Amino acid sequence: MEKKPLTPRQIVERLDQYIVGQLDAKKAVAVALRNRYRRSLLDEKLREEIVPKNILMMGPTGVGKTEIARRIAKLVGAPFVKIEATKFTEVGYVGRDVESMVRDLVETSVRLVKEEKMNEVKGIAEENANKRLVRLLVPGRKKQTGAKNPFEMLFGGNQDQETGEAEKQEDADIENNRKRIAHQLALGELEDHYVTVEVEEQQPSMFDMLQGSGMEQMGMNMQDALSSLMPKKKKRRKLTVREARKVLTNEEAAKLIDMDEAAQEAVQRAEQSGIIFIDEIDKIAKKSGASSSADVSREGVQRDILPIVEGSTVMTKYGAVKTDHVLFIAAGAFHMAKPSDLIPELQGRFPIRVELQKLSIDDFVKILTEPDNALLKQYKALLKTEGISLEFSDDAIRKIAEVAYHVNQDTDNIGARRLHTILERLLEELSFEAPDVTMEEVVITPQYVEEKLGSIAKNKDLSQFIL
């Protein structure tokens, strides 16, 4: 977690930089995160009693459900994993079991903690890596092996003295060369020189085929046990100094990190600040008034998810992980089903319900221009590499937004994702001709938008296939 936790208002402001509208959803996740901080300040007895209030987001596709959860996890440095509810199967059937979401969360947490620890020791690791690079670029003299014959031992006194002096001179030359190379490395003059480095060979896992209920974890455990018994193979690779430094820095950093301590911290972080985002939860809801064998299977998955959301202990290769204080955010479009179609026990575990609104024309205009990673900024940057300054007039932006809105209304509503298809269609010819275009500035006008998209957008049959 951050040293200075963000207030709910600050969290919403940060989210506004990337996501347009959806204030209710932003507030809900901001409060959930702030409550985690509040809980951490309580005494231990009360802290254990307070569980996170899980959130259920409802709204059409492409309005920002997943993006809100993903950005929130980045803001606070929390372990975050996004899973699809439809990927899981009931216990006893072939497929992923629901406990794998917790194992994925712990793996993410371990990766986060490991990165942080590596950044802490990066300076020392780089220093050690540079020393190793110097030794690789200027190897030491080879030590002479093999016993001397008896005559040499008796009569070769002067020769020994001469050899000793020659070796001293050679050592001094090597040391001077190493100082010179170290200086050149520091100045970055040797970045493109090649050097041969020994690196650990990545062996393909024989347990990749072990998938399904329980087998996945068993395969990982057996693989870990065998890898600790078998010596790690190394292979020689020819790399540039720049690439070799990265490899050696990682190796040196790994030596400086206590992995047992890192794993312990990662498990604790997953338990206390982990976020699991369950997408497409409406797809495992039983359809109203319908009944089939598929519905029975869906209900089975819900019943398997239930104990994890309620709070249970899951075994992972890093130890037992409790899910009591993991924050679960579920999301679904709920076109065909309603939240009430979920089993009652699961409904009760998502007390905070947030409905995300459909995007209006004004929302589309904001999405195109306002966020830090706005689509128009991306296209401008791409064409800038070809020496073209791409500009959009305000009326053209409005026209693009209107086309996106109307196509969503007339066909399937896919939210902001519609803008991707429309902009690709609009700029297709320009992107193709860009390397040969001599104009330095290209301005997109409403007339150009109408010319490229107008006829397609108005024809419902065409827009279904093209936009």
UniProtKB/Swiss-Prot annotation:
Keywords: ATP-binding, Chaperone, Cytoplasm, Nucleotide-binding. Residues 165-174 have a biased composition (Basic and acidic residues). GO terms for cellular component: HslUV protease complex. One of its GO terms (biological process) is proteolysis involved in protein catabolic process. ATP binds at residues 20, 62-67, 279, 345, 417. It is found in: Cytoplasm. It holds the Pfam family AAA. CDD domains: RecA-like_HslU (cd19498). Disulfide bonds: none annotated. The keyword Chaperone applies. SUPFAM superfamilies: P-loop containing nucleoside triphosphate hydrolases. Residues 147-174 are annotated as: Disordered. GO terms for molecular function: ATP binding; ATP hydrolysis activity; peptidase activity; proteasome-activating activity. Belongs to the ClpX chaperone family. HslU subfamily. ATPase subunit of a proteasome-like degradation complex; this subunit has chaperone activity. A double ring-shaped homohexamer of ClpQ is capped on each side by a ring-shaped ClpY homohexamer. The assembly of the ClpQ/ClpY complex is dependent on binding of ATP. This is ATP-dependent protease ATPase subunit ClpY.
